[in-house]
Structures are given as C-alpha cells and as structure tokens.
Design a protein with these regions (language model features):
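Amphipathic alpha-helical repeat scaffolds of TPR domains
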Residues: 11-29, 50-73, 97-110, 136-148, ...
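Extreme N-terminal leader/anchor segments
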Residues: 1-16, 211
Length: 212
C-alpha cells in the first residue's frame, strides 16, 4: 500500500503529461500549435511538475516557452520574456539531470538570442561537449556556435574544439562542407587545425577547393 502511494504521483504526472508530449511531437514535426493550445500545454506541463518533479517535464516546458517566443518574435519584448522562461526551465531540467548534451546546447543557443556575454555562452557549449562529445544531432550546429564565440575559449578548450572538428569531418565530408562553406569559417578552422591536425586540414582544404 505504501509503495503504491509513493508511485501514484509519478503515474498521475505521466498520465497528465501525455498531451504535452503530443504537442512537443507536433512542434518537432513542424506542425503549428494554436496559441491557445500552446498556452494550455504550458499549464499542463506545470501541473506535471507539481505532481512529480522530473527533468523531462522541465525540458518540455522549456520547449513550449521557446516555441511561443518564436511565434512572438525572439527579439520582441514578449519573445525575450518567454526566452527567459525557457532558459529558466532548461536550467531546472539540467539541475536534475546534468548529462543532457542537447539541452546544454539549446541553452547556449537561447543565451545567444538573449544577448548574453560570449563567456556565458561558452560555458554551456563546453558542458554540451563534455556531456555528449559524440552527440551527432548537435555536433555540427554546436561547432558553428563555438566558432562564433571562439575568443571566449581558453587554449586547452580550443584543443577540444579541434578534436570536435575532426569528428564532424569524419562523420560526413559533404555535411561538413555544407555547414562551414565560407571563408570566415575556413580561416578559423585553419587556425585551430594547423598545428594539431595538419593532414586533416590539408584534406579539408582540397575538398573545399573542388566545390568552388
């Protein structure tokens, strides 16, 4: 009986949260949510959290706030306020479950939209790398963001970025070239790889030249 009473809040929260998961799936499939539905799902997610404090519920709440911010316009006053709520919810999720590479990256991306300082963004990016160095879903966009705030990285951390660049290159030459197809990116990549991975850099340059 005692075991059942302990488990019941978790079960009740999971059942309550089903509509939120359905809504998040719609967002992931780029299917629009009416504003009223998104607002209702936010309240449902908050109720799930009140029933059982779970990192996934906080992450879903963050996603819903982010979705609403996008609909309002990220740089509008309303959008900025919603982004702050999205960031707060993401931090709560990471407090409960820190080993979430995708969410650390998402939080760094939100920081960019909130005009946070590069060193603040860099810390989240490093956490994303440390908790998921081979997380292919965020490997390339994370690297693009890292390169945009490169001066905030210490030398030891730049060595980590060099390894990440090699991993992304080895994963798919075609996707790498598409993602980093600009002289500015290649200048930065060259600076990172010249001493640490000269042969890989030579291979990159050769393939980039054949595409132009």
């Amino acid at each position: 009986m005692a075991l059942g009473s302990v488990a019941w809040p978790r079960v009740k929260a999971a059942l309550n949260h089903i509509p939120v998961e359905t809504g998040i799936d719609k967002i992931a499939r780029h299917r629009p949510l009416p504003e009223a539905e998104a607002s209702r799902l936010i309240e449902t997610a908050k109720k799930s959290i009140a029933l059982f404090d779970h990192p996934d519920y906080w992450q879903d709440l963050s996603e819903l706030f982010h979705y609403q911010a996008q609909k309002q316009g990220f740089y509008s006053d309303a959008g900025q306020a919603l982004l702050k709520q999205s960031a707060d919810s993401a931090r709560q999720s990471l407090h409960l479950s820190p080993a979430n590479s995708k969410l650390w990256y998402k939080l760094a991306a939100i920081d960019v939209l909130l005009h946070e300082q590069p060193d603040t963004i860099q810390k989240k990016l490093l956490m994303s790398i440390r908790t998921g160095p081979h997380e292919t879903a965020v490997l390339t966009p994370r690297l693009r963001l890292c390169l945009s705030v490169l001066p905030a990285f210490a030398q030891a951390d730049r060595d980590v970025l060099s390894s990440q660049l090699v991993d992304a290159w080895n994963l798919s030459h075609k996707r790498f070239i598409k993602a980093f197809d600009s002289a500015l990116y290649m200048d930065t990549i060259s600076a990172l790889l010249t001493n640490s991975h000269p042969l890989v850099l030579k291979e990159m340059v050769a393939e980039f030249e054949t595409t132009h």
